[in-house]
UniProtKB/Swiss-Prot annotation:
Protein name in UniProt: V(D)J recombination-activating protein 2
Residue positions binding Zn(2+) 2: C447, H453, C479, H482
Subunit note: Component of the RAG complex composed of core components RAG1 and RAG2.
Keyword Zinc: yes
Zinc finger (PHD-type): 417-485
Compositionally biased spans, kind Acidic residues: 373-383
Cellular localization per UniProt: Nucleus
Species lineage: Eukaryota, Metazoa, Chordata, Craniata, Vertebrata
Coiled coil feature spans: none
């Protein structure tokens, strides 16, 4: 096992606990940002471009016949293989949290319809469900089982909000474990059936599940009711005859106490379990190999990688399966840093063949890519310490149809921490926000001299009102070094003086005309 650090070039703050990674044709895509999508990527799906140990995120598009897919954190995700010898597959997404902390009970089918060097297009379809529909939840698992030429979707575990009748202002966002029911979903017709098994007594969430043929193994998990991580190991067997399905459960020995573990597949019958937690404040640094053969499971401990000191001493970590024995791990940066999106990312390669193929990352996962689950038991997720926001403007893309990936290749020259002029004093280590609109990067403005270059607004001594005026107005700006060139090339236009109209008095008294007696007698005789 090898551990390698990657540097995030752009928009790394979008990668948060609860996010998911999808693999299509060897290309890894990110889904499930914490906030609502920005205009630069309205779909919320990004292509992870990892080259030369640098991670870049590029927006993806949806087809016109796609439904709306909100960014969901902690959903249940699994793959559905195509028929025949086709390598194409679809992803099934169920449940999860929206940015408004609402829980989803919908199920989506996501597939790739077009892939070019500059643009990737997906199709997302919402599947209608009927019968015993699973309630809205998160932190659960979804798997596909195959029996007698048929396929079924199996949903188990997770957390949900307390019933609406019991919700008060103080307990509005309180969550509980879902009932330990097993749901079978007919993928073709959308019919759902729930099963209550006597072996499953307590609800579980953030557990690990791996499937092979008609059998699902459920390992570990966290019980919110008891606040424990029981070393449980369940075996679910699903038989699909011509009549009603038959679901049986058995308790096996040799379980592991782990929650939020990450499973990656390294072979046809071999999986690797990494990461997770063994208590509320202790990470699980041990790795295990899971082998599924001859209708049985074998879990053995394997040699762990050389964890870096940052990973060993951090309080939390998160990650997702990238496929073929590769896992993306993330840890938050040091608290003393002023840059709020300073996340550190590592790629853990569990397969020896993949250690030599850094660019080939494909995924064949049979379980949910479990993520950090302490957002509900401890205030990590919504605290200011780990609150990040995405800078959508760093993509510099107004229309996804005209997106040019070559525009992102020059970020080293047009970054926020360049030396914009001779008197530039912006340093990444000492910079603090100067304008009220700044958050974690200094405000910059484009100088229109020549081919154009970016300068810091603070180095140009621009006031905040002037900066806002220049950003809203459609005018050219010239920095302090090129402003004299602009004056010499342009002749000032003569200002047209407007004549000031005198204001009329609102209450002007009319002059009274006096009529003499002679005029009165004349008028009287005239009308007689």
């Amino acid at each position: 096992m090898s551990l390698q650090m990657v540097s995030a070039v752009s928009n790394s703050s979008l990668l948060q606990p609860g996010s998911s990674l999808l693999n299509f044709d060897g290309h890894v895509f990110f889904f499930g940002q914490k906030g609502w999508p920005k205009r630069s990527c309205p779909t919320g799906v990004f292509f992870l471009d990892i080259k030369q140990n640098e991670l870049k995120m590029k927006p993806a598009a949806f087809s016109r016949d796609s439904c709306y897919l909100p960014p969901l954190r902690y959903p249940a995700i699994c793959t559905l293989r195509g028929n025949g010898e086709s390598d194409k597959h679809q992803y099934i997404i169920h449940g999860g949290k929206t940015p408004n902390n609402d829980l989803s009970d919908k199920i989506y089918i996501m597939s790739m319809v077009n892939k070019t060097t500059k643009k990737t297009t997906f199709q997302c379809i919402e599947k209608d469900l009927g019968g015993d529909v699973p309630e809205a939840r998160y932190g659960h698992t979804i798997n596909v089982v195959h029996s007698r030429g048929k396929s079924m979707i199996v949903i188990f575990g997770g957390r949900s909000y307390i019933p609406l009748a019991q919700r008060t202002t103080e307990k509005w966002n309180s969550v509980v474990d879902c009932l330990p029911s097993v749901f079978l979903v007919d993928f073709e017709f959308g019919c759902c059936t729930s099963y209550i098994l006597p072996e499953l007594q307590d609800g579980l969430s953030f557990h690990v599940s791996v499937a092979r043929d008609d059998t699902i193994y459920i390992l570990g998990g966290h019980s919110l009711q008891n606040n424990t991580r029981p070393p449980s190991l369940y075996k679910l067997k699903v038989d699909l005859p011509l009549g009603s399905p038959c679901v049986t459960c058995s308790i096996l020995p040799g379980g592991i106490s782990v929650s939020s573990g990450i499973v990656t597949q390294t072979g046809d019958t071999e999986f690797v379990l990494v990461g997770g937690y063994q208590s509320d404040n202790q990470k699980r640094m041990i790795c295990n190999t899971i082998v599924l053969e001859d209708n049985k499971i074998e879990i053995v401990e394997r040699v762990s990688p050389d964890w870096t000191p940052d990973i060993k001493h951090c309080r939390m970590w998160f990650g997702c399966d990238m496929g073929k024995g590769s896992v993306l791990l993330g840890i938050p940066g040091a608290n003393k840093q002023l840059i709020s999106d300073a996340n550190y990312f590592y790629i853990l390669r569990c397969n020896k063949a993949e250690e030599d193929e850094e660019e080939e990352l494909t995924a064949q996962t049979c379980s949910q890519a479990s993520t950090e689950d302490q957002g509900d038991s401890t205030p990590f997720e919504d605290s200011e310490e780990f609150s990040f926001s995405a800078e959508a403007s760093s993509f510099d893309v107004d229309d996804i149809d005209t997106y040019n990936e070559d525009d992102e290749e020059d970020e080293s020259e047009t970054g926020y921490w360049i030396i914009c002029c001779a008197s530039c004093n912006i340093d990444i280590n000492t910079w603090v926000p100067f304008y009220s609109t700044e958050l974690n990067k200094p405000a910059m403005i484009l100088c229109s001299s020549g081919s154009g270059h970016w300068v810091h607004a603070q180095c140009m001594d621009l006031s905040e009102s002037m900066l806002l005026q220049l950003s809203e107005a459609n005018v050219k700006y010239f920095c302090n070094e090129h402003v004299h060139l602009n004056k010499g090339l342009q002749t000032p236009k003569k200002a047209v003086h407007l004549k000031k109209q005198p204001m009329k008095r609102l209450h002007k008294k009319k002059t009274m005309k006096l009529t003499t007696p002679v005029k009165k007698s004349f008028l009287r005789r005239l009308f007689e």
